[in-house]
Design a protein with these regions (language model features):
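Conserved binding/catalytic microenvironments
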Residues: 2-10, 129-300
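Short alpha-helical "recognition helix" segments of helix-turn-helix
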Residues: 32-40, 68, 274-278, 288
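Recognition helix of helix-turn-helix/homeodomain-like DNA-binding domains
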Residues: 43-60, 81-85
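Key DNA-contacting residues within the recognition helix of helix-turn-helix
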Residues: 50-51, 66, 80, 289
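DNA major-groove recognition helix of helix-turn-helix/homeodomain DNA-binding modules
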Residues: 61-78
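Short coil turns linking two alpha-helices in DNA-binding domains
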Residues: 34, 45-48, 61, 75, ...
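A short, Lys/Arg-rich alpha-helix, primarily the initiator
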Residues: 1-37
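Short, charged recognition helix plus adjacent turn
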Residues: 3-4, 81-130, 184-188
Length: 300
């Protein structure tokens, strides 16, 4: 029998590792996921499963990836990118988990309402008596206004938006690449208020789309915590709302409404629109999907 070198197909090994992590996320840690659970997705016996895990088996046939996509309820385009080596493990897991909430709806809203009425003093200041709707208002128009002011200040007119150029507008906000990081980003702060300095280190020398999103989120938090004039019109809010606002800000900054409208007119409708736009704006397909839904609902 011909002996196949271990890790001959490293992207297949990454795909295996991702599938195992995705199953673990699905079961929320309540079920111990073993290697054979991953192999079972494709009906593999223990030997084939082991070969896949060790990168001895090349998994990239479209029909096979579709089977995995159906089992994990995931966009097959992400699996195709993993199998082709375009997306690494950390980025794939981030994509699978999603980019977080961009609005306060459904179960999240209901849970916050219960907590608010059970313990209102946790959210209300001494002289503040705001309603739930006022206190937990995402205030999208104000976030849009902040993004528009930054885009105008930097005179950005063409996609993609370069984060290093945006950082030039804010000398106290610094981005640094760091190959030694084990997490996607690491944030360090110094000082407070107008003197606040923030350094965001990101993993690797190449700022991948998901890292751009995470850095943009940190920029919003910096603007809020340093009382920047760009966000002076935005009312303070609970941490739960700040997190959603940061997601919304990042999406709007990386894919500004005016630029998106312009680029949508250029795309080839006979091909995958999401893929085309994600490549233009240097964002992931998942974020572009979210941003397009947001754009269609709000027209900006």
């Amino acid at each position: 029998m011909k002996k196949i070198a271990e890790n001959r197909y490293p992207h297949s090994a990454t795909l295996f590792k991702f599938c195992k992590e995705a199953l673990d996320i699905r079961y929320e840690g309540n079920v111990k996921v073993i290697d054979q659970d991953v192999g079972a997705i494709l009906g593999y016996d223990p030997a084939d499963c082991s070969h896949w895990k060790k990168g001895k088996k090349n998994i990239r046939a479209l029909s096979t990836l579709r089977t995995i996509a159906d089992h994990l309820s995931i966009d097959e385009r992400l699996l195709i990118d993993i199998a082709a080596g375009k997306v690494g493990f950390d980025e794939a897991v981030f994509e699978y988990r999603g980019y977080g909430a961009f609005g306060l709806t459904g179960r999240t809203s209901e849970n916050l309402k219960k907590e608010f009425f059970k313990n209102p003093s946790r959210y209300q200041g001494e002289n503040s008596r705001l309603s739930f709707e006022e206190l937990f208002d995402i205030d999208r128009p104000s976030i849009c206004k902040a993004v528009d002011s930054i885009v105008a200040a930097g005179k950005f007119e063409e996609a993609p938006v370069y984060l290093p150029e945006i950082c030039q507008l804010f000398p106290n906000f610094t981005i640094v690449s760091d190959d030694t990081l084990t997490t996607p980003v690491q944030v360090t702060t110094e000082g407070q208020g107008a003197d606040l300095k923030v350094t965001v280190r990101h993993k690797g020398s190449d700022m991948r789309p998901y890292l751009r999103f995470l850095v943009a989120r940190e920029l919003f938090k910096y603007l809020v915590n340093s009382s920047s004039l760009h966000v002076a019109h935005i009312r303070t809010c609970p941490d739960e709302v700040l997190d959603i606002r940061a997601n919304l800000f990042a999406g709007l900054l990386l894919v500004p409404g005016k630029m998106l409208r312009k680029e949508v007119e250029k795309v080839d409708a006979s091909h995958d629109i999401v893929t085309q736009l994600s490549e233009v704006f240097w964002v992931s397909k998942a974020l572009m999907n979210q941003r397009l839904r947001d754009f269609m609902e709000n027209l900006n």
